[in-house]
Amino acid sequence: MAGSRTNDIKVYCSFCGKSQDDVKKIIAGNNVFICNECVALSQEIIKEELAEEVLADLTEVPKPKELLDVLNQYVVGQDRAKRALSVAVYNHYKRVSFTESRDDDDVDLQKSNILMIGPTGSGKTFLAQTLAKSLNVPFAIADATSLTEAGYVGEDVENILLKLIQAADYNVERAERGIIYVDEIDKIAKKGENVSITRDVSGEGVQQALLKIIEGTVASVPPQGGRKHPNQEMIQIDTKNILFIVGGAFDGIEEIVKQRLGEKVIGFGQNSRKIDDNASYMQEIISEDIQKFGLIPEFIGRLPVVAALEQLNTSDLIQILTEPRNALVKQYQALLSYDGVELAFDKEALEAIANKAIERKTGARGLRSIIEETMLDIMFEIPSQEDVTKVRITKAAVEGKSKPVLETA
């Protein structure tokens, strides 16, 4: 019932007392009525309270050890990177909380945005996702290779902010305290140390565009994205409290580190030392190396925290398959359990899966596709075979030389 007379009885709002003649619409409940004006007022009150809850949440930021404990539940290895991220994230949200209550004469704390360097499949994206989830803040992922500077065909950097606003259900106050992860940042590095006189649509220009929102600005974001709707009303969002994490593989940067350390490696004296492998060189990266790779100094300066991730080995990948709370083996065991079937992986099968991922150079992100390949036929047949009680995945099954072993009742 809404906004009309019933049996010539005039209806009044149970909250403000206005009659149906004084408002646009009245909604009827069980002996209760509410007008459209009270509905709108209620929505505003709820919105304000939710915004206050966001601010309140930030006053209870998990300590670095607590953040590390969460990361350890889901992410295998990368201990040094996890510690660096835990400290950086804690300091960032402590800064946000401090800024909300600071006086004008207090110390101005700068943002600690993060640069993650590591090979494909080493866990960069997953680390950022896990941190955002543990903090219950909006999270958005963007690919740097799809971005172009304003005026060129491609995606504007402002669209990254739109993704975050959408993740926050268009609650701008909540989005302003979210986390944005920009992947493939190494792909927009300048091609060489000399600045080209031609326009660099996908390189330095994009770095300059990203620089503005990373360091903190009030950006105008088109709610429908892109440049197709020039007359649309813009959303204003302040990026000063958004944590930006950027990541990339930076293939070949270890060679730059080797060149810089060359004199120390072959020379004599107290500064001389020997570094054994590329993984160790990754831990020696400094801003000078990143600049030589092709990121501009201003951009590097806005990313003071550098976390280097190492290539995952067979042992690491087996741990990823079996140990975390959301381990892939546990997920597939749960899937088959819904059909009343037990799933087991031989130790050799797990090693074969890990080795395949290493051969394909996909790291942890390639593990699921390998299991899917191995189990596709089984997952197709099992729901129709009610006598099957157990499936065992062998090394031969992973290598495609035989089918998984089935046990029946």
Curated annotation (Swiss-Prot):
Annotated SMART domains: AAA (SM00382), ClpB_D2-small (SM01086), zf-C4_ClpX (SM00994)
Q: Which GO terms describe its biological process?
A: cell division; proteolysis involved in protein catabolic process
Where along this sequence does the record place binding of ATP?
119-126
GO MF terms listed in the record are: ATP binding; ATP hydrolysis activity; ATP-dependent protein folding chaperone; protein dimerization activity; unfolded protein binding; zinc ion binding
Q: Looking at the keywords, is Chaperone present?
A: yes
- Cite the entry's keywords alphabetically: ATP-binding, Chaperone, Metal-binding, Nucleotide-binding, Zinc
Q: A single GO CC term, please? A: HslUV protease complex
In terms of CDD domains, this protein maps to: RecA-like_ClpX
Where Zn(2+) binds, per the record, is at 13, 16, 35, 38
The record's subunit annotation is: Component of the ClpX-ClpP complex. Forms a hexameric ring that, in the presence of ATP, binds to fourteen ClpP subunits assembled into a disk-like structure with a central cavity, resembling the structure of eukaryotic proteasomes.
Q: HAMAP family this protein is in?
A: ClpX
The Swiss-Prot or TrEMBL record describes its family as follows: Belongs to the ClpX chaperone family.
Extract the NCBIfam families matched here: clpX (TIGR00382), PRK05342.1 (NF003745)
Question: What protein am I looking at?
Answer: ATP-dependent Clp protease ATP-binding subunit ClpX
